[in-house]
């Protein structure tokens, strides 16, 4: 099967024509992938936001991970970065390195997931590069747009700002541990839930939706506490109410019903949640909650910015 695939699609152009051309959505600036470069129209009242991420086999994903999961991960990590800056995606470039184990079915599932996500979040593939090596790796550069007055950064919080978190945290960590043979008392349904939380992360685009009310923002890729520290100015700190940090009922049940030697701080410090931590003036509280409800986004106020440096969690400094 793989020999037939390699014989039939024995050049970069043939693979691109078969699997990737559909992803350009026939946008004029892509030149249907016939040129060596593409272009984007600029926007008078918007800033162009650029972010890039790389994921590597045996570091960011496993060899046997489903190809649609790998596609979802490379898209999610970039959309999450854009959202944290108050931006929505326009397009992206993709550099994909494949090896001899990649076949027709793998590429079909991979590009089908890309197509679905592009449709869902309204962006398209501008171009990229395809190469071969011993390990699979992907690097994507995303271009987004944001209104000039609403671009977000990590250093604009003020003392007294509320600290908010979207979604639930920690489920991805449990999924990763299950895939690494952690023995937990879980039925197949709950086990699948946690594994899918790791394999199929979902970006939260609330940064764009609420950008006019947000003072600072970051996505949770390196863990709640690690990323929160990045939001704090040198002379600012945070008071966090740990019991308010949102975790799913499934995770809470797991912690209560298993002999689990990890604390909630350990779980929250792992990362790969791709939710948002953001700060906002308390006067915008009701408007932010209203936007979250309208867009069916879970939102939790977990603390506030304080003058004393450091992160304080239930009166314990971390």
Spans of model-derived segments:
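Helix-biased detector of long, well-ordered alpha-helical tracts
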Residues: 1-318
């Amino acid at each position: 099967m793989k020999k037939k695939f390699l014989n039939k699609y024995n050049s970069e152009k043939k693979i691109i024509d078969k699997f990737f051309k559909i992803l350009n959505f026939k946008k004029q600036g892509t030149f249907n992938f016939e040129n060596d470069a593409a272009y984007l129209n600029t926007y008078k009242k918007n800033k162009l936001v650029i972010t890039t991420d790389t994921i590597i086999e045996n570091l960011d994903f496993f060899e046997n991970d489903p190809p649609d999961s790998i596609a979802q991960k490379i898209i999610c990590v970039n959309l999450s970065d854009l959202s944290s800056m108050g931006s929505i995606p326009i397009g992206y470039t993709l550099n994909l390195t494949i090896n001899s184990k990649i076949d027709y079915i793998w590429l079909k599932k991979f590009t089908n997931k890309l197509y679905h996500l592009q449709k869902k979040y309204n962006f398209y593939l501008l171009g990229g590069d395809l190469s071969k090596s011993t390990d699979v790796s992907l690097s994507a550069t995303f271009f987004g747009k944001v209104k000039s007055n609403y671009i977000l950064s990590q250093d604009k919080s003020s003392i007294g700002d509320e600290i908010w978190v979207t979604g639930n945290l920690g489920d991805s960590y449990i999924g990763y541990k299950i895939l690494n043979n952690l023995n937990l008392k879980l039925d197949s349904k709950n086990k699948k839930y946690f594994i899918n939380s790791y394999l199929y992360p979902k970006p939260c685009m609330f940064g764009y939706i609420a950008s006019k009310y947000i003072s600072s923002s970051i996505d949770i890729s390196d863990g709640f506490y690690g990323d929160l520290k990045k939001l704090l100015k040198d002379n600012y700190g945070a008071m966090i109410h740990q019991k308010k940090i949102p975790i799913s009922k499934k995770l809470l049940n797991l912690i209560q019903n298993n002999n689990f030697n990890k604390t909630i701080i350990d779980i929250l410090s792992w990362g790969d949640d791709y939710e948002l931590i953001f700060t906002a003036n308390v006067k915008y509280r009701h408007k932010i909650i209203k936007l979250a409800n309208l867009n069916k986004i879970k939102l939790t106020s977990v603390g506030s910015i304080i003058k004393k440096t450091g992160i304080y969690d239930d009166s314990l400094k971390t």
